[in-house]
UniProtKB/Swiss-Prot annotation:
It is found in: Cytoplasm. RNA chaperone with significant RNA binding, RNA strand exchange and RNA duplexing activities. InterPro entries: ProQ, ProQ/FinO, ProQ/FinO_sf, ProQ_C. The lineage of its organism: Bacteria, Pseudomonadati, Pseudomonadota, Gammaproteobacteria, Vibrionales. The keyword Electron transport does not apply. Residues 107-127 have a biased composition (Basic and acidic residues). It comes from Vibrio cholerae serotype O1 (strain ATCC 39315 / El Tor Inaba N16961). It comes from the Bacteria. The keyword Chaperone applies. This is RNA chaperone ProQ.
Length: 208
């Protein structure tokens, strides 16, 4: 039993009619100009063929005659052919001009699409290009928390410790400063600081 499954698209239909009418339709090389009204001839010849419908034939014929192969074949001096390859008259000048204009327009559209595609690819590549990372600046060391110096624990100086040469601390209000007793005059005591400066202070301001 023959396979009667319908053809799926215009490409398959063109291949099928090229097989049925090899002297008229070709799949390779320059195509021959077709007889005017050849669609009706096709529809009549394939009327009982379950593989293809008139709608499919019309779409396939439109695709075939708008291909670059076919438009290249429509040139001065070329002859139209019928389904069996028989000549059906020479092409008219207006038909040649129309075919050449259609070919130029089709090529221009393809070129425009190609340029648009190239532009799109470049833009996508540019967008996907990883951005150069800025050199990381050396992190500044965070200020270490200031360690509060605990004041040196001192005690009140005993009267027996008020002797020349003894090391003492002078209470200066903001803190104690090391000093050496150089002279004792009752409650007044002369001391010498570590920087060599001498001063008289009250005994009550001295601590051990």
């Amino acid at each position: 039993m023959e396979n009667t499954e319908k053809l799926k698209n215009s490409k398959e239909v063109i291949a099928y009619i090229a097989e049925c009418f090899p002297n008229c339709f070709t799949l390779e090389g320059e195509a021959k100009p077709l007889k005017i009204g050849i669609f009706q001839d096709l529809a009549d010849r394939l009327n009982d063929d379950p593989k293809v419908s008139k709608t499919q034939l019309r779409a396939a014929l439109r695709q075939y005659t708008s291909s670059w192969r076919y438009l290249h074949g429509v040139k001065p001096g070329a002859t139209r052919v019928d389904l069996d390859g028989n000549p059906c008259g020479e092409l008219e000048e207006q038909h040649v001009e129309h075919a050449q204009a259609a070919l130029a327009e089709s090529k221009a559209r393809v070129e425009a699409r190609r340029k648009e595609q190239v532009k799109k690819v470049r833009e996508e590549a540019k967008a996907n290009k990883p951005k150069a990372k800025k050199p990381q600046q050396a992190r500044r060391p965070q200020n270490a928390p200031k360690v509060e110096k605990k004041p040196v624990e001192t005690r009140a100086l005993a009267a027996s410790e008020l002797n020349v040469g003894n090391q003492v601390n002078v209470n200066m209000g903001k803190g104690n400063m090391a000093a050496t007793i150089v002279e004792v005059n009752k409650e007044d005591v002369r001391v010498q600081l570590a920087n060599g400066l001498q001063m008289v202070v009250k005994a009550e301001h001295l601590r051990a």
